[in-house]
Amino acid sequence: MIHQAVILAAGRGVRLGALTQDRPKSMLPIAGKPIMARLMDGLRAAGVQEFVVVAGADDHSVAEYFGNNGHVGGQVIIVHQLRPTGTVDALLQAAPHITGPFLLSSVDNLTSSDHVTNLAARFLAHPDNVAALSLLPATPDQIRHSADVHIDGDRIAGIEEKPAAPRSIYAAIMLYAFSRQLLDYLPAVPVSPRGEREIASAIQASIEDGCRVGYAITDWRLHLTRDSDLLAINQYYLQRDGEHSILSTLPDTVTVVPPVRIDPGVVVGPDSVVGPNTYLETGSAIGAGARLRDCVVLRGARVAPGAERSGQIIASA
């Protein structure tokens, strides 16, 4: 079992557009919790007890949410990446707090706790492992936007970030198990053609030094990169948990069709129909007679009286 995890959360989520204008990607809500907390829930279920979060230079929202450790079991340490110069520099910010074997995950990458447990077990099964990678079946185009791997039996013989010509049927996704030895390779990692220092280069350098790198395969993950992903991930958690969670007072004439999550501090007008597969965040308001299904309504958003919305992220203007 691995007890420590580093979470990379410094990215602003540019491809999410207006959704990240007033908060970082790590704080986007998934059925009542930030995606950061959802990720921590899965890691904690696999045995993680301490988290080191690498936040952006001016990002205080993570500290505000986790500052008292009341929202998640285990200790939360927050450090800041001053410049967005890649995963290597982000991990270097966390390095002083790493005490032994650890997991590394991006904040936008959700996998099952069973896979996390399997990844940790495969890493720990070989004492000479410097790393174990999470692999996901992928198309060549998907691999071009991720990392390609060369598999040799039960180990990784090579890794390349964003390859022009992928050789594998698997992409390495941003969930790794590492020994502290991997940290020794970080300072020498060069800047890539993309202008960043990338963790795949450190892994490749360790392989070239003769270090052992293992892997575990998963066929499932949720990845938040676009607004359609935020909708899909919310619907996954709503359907997984089922029924409904209503934390605001609603008029008697409101119809709720589960699964639905309504946070505290939501205003819902009379004669509205909410659901199925709908999440209303604190600070949102639904006009009288509105009908919502398969929607996420974010804080500050207003749905006009009588409006009908389906399959949408509804954000403030």
Question: What spans do the regions from the language model cover?
Answer:
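Active-site glycine-centered loops adjacent to acidic/histidine catalytic or metal-binding residues
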Residues: 11, 108, 226
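A structural signal for short hydrophobic beta-strand segments in well-ordered beta-sheet cores
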Residues: 27, 148-151, 215
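Short internal beta-strands
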Residues: 52-56, 134-135, 296
